[in-house]
């Protein structure tokens, strides 16, 4: 039987660099590579939104936990619901561990749903991890003028309720459209916003009635004061197994699903937020550098200085290890094609 060539540093990578006896030497190789270099993290959304803020805070501490202590900078690359950044990391960025990307897990899964513009395979990225294991929700600003407080209220609204989104590939579009098609809710999605911050500002200005894709972590850091003031109401949350305190008495959508098949289709759409802000390296990045970066993301998020900064800004981090993130993306591809097609139909924008 032909065996692949043995690479000591790849073996050490699988042992988290140091557990294997040759790991120290590999760690030295990683340190030698990164010393004096700069790592760029591309964020697939505009400045000031949840993706941007949480990534920048993380980046401030990330470099000191990477062997060689490289400088880490963040660059915004919005476009097509973060697909522009996803394509860049897959096809354009150098495959050496100096360019990473943070983009939506929903965007990463667009090839599964047949999006021809999504010219990448999420199973081939080197997943470094995810900054959050999150649950999403939808919020309504001042009851949309109809006193909407729950998902049943939204479903039965007499006047069309509008939600804002960056693009059809984003959960700000997919989540409300799932509600529309699953429950026949009277709602519409308005596109063209550059980022989640722009969607939220439009909601507060009254251009639209609500916003979906509201992560548990973002609600605490950016919107808690509006909820307490009675201006904004979380009307539905998408966690399957737990309720989120910050979401108050919001309807749990899964409780309204009637069949196992409906729940499996919902899992395909809403379990993605367990990888709320995934961090990826290009396919082909050397394994020892991937292992070092995977260790560094976990070390960064438990760094006392990072924890203090996060608490000050009311940002919650609940990281997902890179190996687990990779396994989750692979699992999505094991979904039966008929259920994938249902999920695609439920999240398709209405014809213009």
Explain the meaning of each model-derived region.
Residues 24-27:
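Boundary at the C-terminal end of the N-terminal hydrophobic targeting segment
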Residues 39, 64-69, 88-99, 107-205, ...:
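Hinge/capping helix and adjacent helix->loop/strand transition within the periplasmic-binding protein
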Residues 9-22:
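Bacterial N-terminal signal peptides
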Residues 41-55, 78-81, 164-171:
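Extracytoplasmic "Venus flytrap"
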Residues 35-37, 228-231, 235, 256, ...:
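An extracytoplasmic/periplasmic, membrane-proximal ligand-sensing/linker region
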Residues 58, 80-83, 97-110, 130-133, ...:
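Ligand-binding clamshell of periplasmic/extracellular solute-binding protein-like
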Residues 1-6:
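N-terminal secretory signal peptides that target proteins for export/translocation
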Residues 105-117, 173, 177-182, 205, ...:
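A ligand-binding cleft/hinge motif common to bilobed small-molecule-binding domains
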């Amino acid at each position: 039987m032909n065996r692949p060539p043995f690479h000591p540093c790849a073996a050490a990578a699988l042992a988290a660099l140091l557990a294997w006896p040759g790991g120290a030497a590999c760690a030295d190789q990683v340190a030698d590579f990164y010393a004096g270099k700069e790592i760029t993290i591309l964020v697939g959304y505009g400045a000031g939104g949840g993706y941007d803020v949480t990534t920048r805070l993380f980046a401030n501490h990330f470099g000191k936990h990477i062997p060689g202590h490289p400088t880490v900078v963040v660059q915004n690359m919005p476009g097509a619901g973060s697909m522009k950044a996803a394509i860049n990391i897959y096809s354009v960025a150098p495959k050496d561990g100096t360019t990473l990307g943070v983009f939506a897990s929903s965007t990463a899964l667009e090839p599964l749903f047949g999006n021809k513009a999504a010219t990448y395979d999420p199973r081939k990225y080197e997943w470094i991890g995810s900054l959050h294991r999150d649950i999403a929700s939808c919020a309504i600003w001042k009851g949309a003028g109809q006193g909407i407080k729950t998902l049943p209220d939204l479903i039965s609204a007499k006047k069309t309720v509008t939600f804002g989104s960056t693009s059809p590939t984003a959960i700000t579009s997919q989540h409300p459209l799932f509600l529309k098609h699953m429950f026949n809710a009277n709602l519409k999605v308005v596109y063209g916003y550059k980022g989640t911050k722009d969607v939220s500002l439009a909601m507060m200005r009254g251009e639209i009635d609500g916003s979906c894709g509201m992560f548990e972590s973002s609600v605490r850091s950016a919107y808690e004061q509006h909820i307490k003031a009675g201006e904004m109401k979380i009307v539905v949350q998408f966690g399957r197994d737990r309720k989120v305190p910050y979401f108050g008495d919001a309807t749990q959508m899964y409780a309204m699903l009637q069949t196992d098949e409906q729940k499996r289709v919902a899992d395909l759409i809403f379990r993605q937020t367990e990888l709320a802000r995934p961090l990826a390296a290009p396919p082909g990045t050397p394994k020892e550098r991937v292992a070092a970066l995977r260790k560094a993301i976990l070390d960064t998020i438990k760094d006392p200085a990072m924890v203090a900064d996060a608490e000050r800004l009311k940002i919650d981090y609940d990281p997902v290890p890179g190996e687990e993130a990779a396994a989750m993306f692979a699992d999505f591809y094991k979904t039966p094609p008929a259920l994938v097609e249902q999920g695609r139909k439920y999240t398709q924008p209405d014809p213009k």
